[in-house]
Curated annotation (Swiss-Prot):
<dbReference type="InterPro" id="IPR006137">
    <property type="entry name" value="NADH_UbQ_OxRdtase-like_20kDa"/>
</dbReference>
<keyword id="KW-0479">Metal-binding</keyword>
<keyword id="KW-0874">Quinone</keyword>
<keyword id="KW-0004">4Fe-4S</keyword>
<dbReference type="Pfam" id="PF01058">
    <property type="entry name" value="Oxidored_q6"/>
</dbReference>
<keyword id="KW-1278">Translocase</keyword>
<keyword id="KW-1003">Cell membrane</keyword>
<dbReference type="GO" id="GO:0005506">
    <property type="term" value="F:iron ion binding"/>
</dbReference>
<dbReference type="GO" id="GO:0045271">
    <property type="term" value="C:respiratory chain complex I"/>
</dbReference>
<dbReference type="GO" id="GO:0008137">
    <property type="term" value="F:NADH dehydrogenase (ubiquinone) activity"/>
</dbReference>
<dbReference type="InterPro" id="IPR006138">
    <property type="entry name" value="NADH_UQ_OxRdtase_20Kd_su"/>
</dbReference>
<keyword id="KW-0830">Ubiquinone</keyword>
<comment type="similarity">
    <text>Belongs to the complex I 20 kDa subunit family.</text>
</comment>
<keyword id="KW-0411">Iron-sulfur</keyword>
<dbReference type="GO" id="GO:0050136">
    <property type="term" value="F:NADH:ubiquinone reductase (non-electrogenic) activity"/>
</dbReference>
<dbReference type="GO" id="GO:0048038">
    <property type="term" value="F:quinone binding"/>
</dbReference>
<feature type="binding site">
    <location>
        <position position="68"/>
    </location>
    <ligand>
        <name>[4Fe-4S] cluster</name>
    </ligand>
</feature>
Amino acid sequence: MQYKLTRIDPDAANDQYPIGERETVADPLVEGQVHKNIFMGKLEDVLNSTVNWGRKNSLWPYNFGLSCCYVEMTTAFTAPHDIARFGAEVIRASPRQADFMVIAGTCFIKMAPVIQRLYEQMLEPKWVISMGSCANSGGMYDIYSVVQGVDKFLPVDVYIPGCPPRPEAFLQGLMLLQESIGQERRPLSWVVGDQGVYRAEMPAQKDLKREQRIQVTNLRSPDEV
């Protein structure tokens, strides 16, 4: 599996995310086994898997919304959907206590600096979910006042399509984020291990489900959905 390595450089020339340099590399744990004995290599693998397990099953969302997609997001916290099953029911009012931010709704140019400031106030490790067509690409608002995709100023980990997406789509996006976190390679501290962040290159769902969707011949009417 290929990984995207991001090394943070505070003195980087660019002021956009990701700050620093980014390159595609192989799995760092696999490559590092050549220079380690079996015990230390296995210990690092188990320790990394344990830390990632704790991170992905205890994701605290930041209570933040922009438009109608936020209503669908909050619906996922109700009893019929029960987002507590995934350990993400602890809504935080402060970005300093949150693990991930969901950009749900239309991002206007005047709001972009505010969103970026809130993202900077979040502590590492942190993740971003772009929810809805407006957050992904501007949606139907192809005008001067709307940012055509929040990934122009934030590093987005998961994109959720729809206008607006259903709560089930948000839950699936959360599970995809958990899967991605489970395969990340992060330093255990600021003095232990490689100080780069390795993110696995996850395949797009449209590519994984392409053959399955092509084989669908019985199309239901909107009343039956």
